[in-house]
A protein has these predicted regions:
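Terminal, compositionally biased segments
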Residues: 1-3, 20, 36, 58, ...
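Alpha-helical scaffold segments that form or flank carboxylate-/histidine-based iron centers
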Residues: 4-11, 32-51, 89-93, 118-129
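Acidic/histidine-rich alpha-helical segments that form the ligand environment
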Residues: 7-27, 72-123
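N-terminal first-folded block
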Residues: 29-31, 56
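Conserved alpha-helical segments that form or flank metal/cofactor-binding pockets of metalloenzymes
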Residues: 36-70, 135-139, 143
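Charge-rich, acidic-biased intrinsically disordered regions
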Residues: 43, 61-79, 121-128
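Amphipathic alpha-helical hairpins/coiled-coils and adjacent low-complexity
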Residues: 50, 57-60, 64, 101, ...
């Protein structure tokens, strides 16, 4: 596996963590507004994953199909906190915002240290990643 593929697959896995977390949260929250938002965010993650996977496949490599252990642990942690919290929606929003932080930092790090052949793709996807991050961050702060 090339360095480029490895880097892109890592971003795919981290982004998939977010996608799966949003999909899970849709089932857990009762607020229809949050469910719609989480669905939109999950779709945004799917779009980013597809763009990254397309680049990996174009290099005749196999795109990552899973997530990370850290992503799964964060989801379990959020479930536990939501069970104990009085406002499950705010708990999921806070944990999803942290997932967005992780995704954003991974993309920024990849842009800074990544392979030159991925720069254009990462620059194209970064505004989408940042927009999701900013939206969840604003929502988290509005719920405090």
């Amino acid at each position: 596996m090339t360095r480029t593929t490895s880097q892109l697959n890592e971003l795919i896995e981290i982004t998939r963590d977010g996608q799966r977390f949003y999909q899970h949260a849709i089932q857990e929250v009762k607020d229809a507004r949050l469910q719609r938002l989480f669905q939109s965010m999950a779709q945004a993650k799917t779009d980013v994953i597809n763009a990254l996977a397309g680049k990996v496949a174009a290099n005749h490599e196999d795109p990552a199909t899973g997530g990370t252990l850290l992503g799964k642990l964060r989801q379990v942690y959020a479930d536990t906190r939501a069970t104990l919290a009085s406002d499950e929606g705010a708990t999921y929003v806070a944990q999803l915002e942290e997932a967005e932080d992780r995704i954003l930092h991974a993309f920024e790090d990849a842009l800074e240290k990544g392979a030159p052949e991925t720069q254009a793709l990462l620059r194209a996807e970064l505004p989408k990643v940042r927009a999701c991050h900013d939206q969840m961050s604003q929502l988290k702060h509005s719920l405090k």
